[in-house]
């Protein structure tokens, strides 16, 4: 059960990071922390109850790797266009 406690703590830290950080890269890292917390809980449940949580965790890791590539590409493109990665600046729409 310590896996679930660690997973809940990591997820809470990720939520805190998403809600308080203002740069896109730190928000992105916080989201990745939340995904890793979900992976940890999947593996913890699989260890405790004999389920196939490892397979689901590997799928989440594969999807997260693709998400990292696309997300960092978007952040770099936004930085080149606006010279800032502040989330508050991204909320302004241009027509």
From Swiss-Prot:
It catalyses: a quinone + NADH + 5 H(+)(in) = a quinol + NAD(+) + 4 H(+)(out). The chain crosses the membrane at residues 1-21, 25-45, 59-79. The keyword Ubl conjugation does not apply. It is found in: Cell inner membrane. Its EC number is 7.1.1.-. One of its GO terms (cellular component) is plasma membrane. Belongs to the complex I subunit 4L family. NDH-1 shuttles electrons from NADH, via FMN and iron-sulfur (Fe-S) centers, to quinones in the respiratory chain. The immediate electron acceptor for the enzyme in this species is believed to be a menaquinone. Couples the redox reaction to proton translocation (for every two electrons transferred, four hydrogen ions are translocated across the cytoplasmic membrane), and thus conserves the redox energy in a proton gradient. This is NADH-quinone oxidoreductase subunit K. It comes from Thermus thermophilus (strain ATCC BAA-163 / DSM 7039 / HB27). The gene is nuoK.
């Amino acid at each position: 059960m310590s896996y679930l406690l660690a997973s809940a703590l990591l997820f809470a830290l990720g939520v805190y990071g998403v809600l308080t950080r203002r740069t896109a890269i730190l928000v992105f890292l916080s989201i990745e922390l939340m995904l890793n917390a979900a992976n940890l809980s999947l593996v913890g449940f699989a260890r405790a109850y004999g389920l196939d949580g490892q397979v689901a965790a590997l799928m989440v890791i594969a999807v997260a790797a693709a998400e990292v590539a696309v997300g960092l590409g978007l952040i770099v493109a936004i930085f080149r266009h606006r010279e800032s990665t502040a989330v508050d600046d991204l909320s302004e729409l241009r027509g």
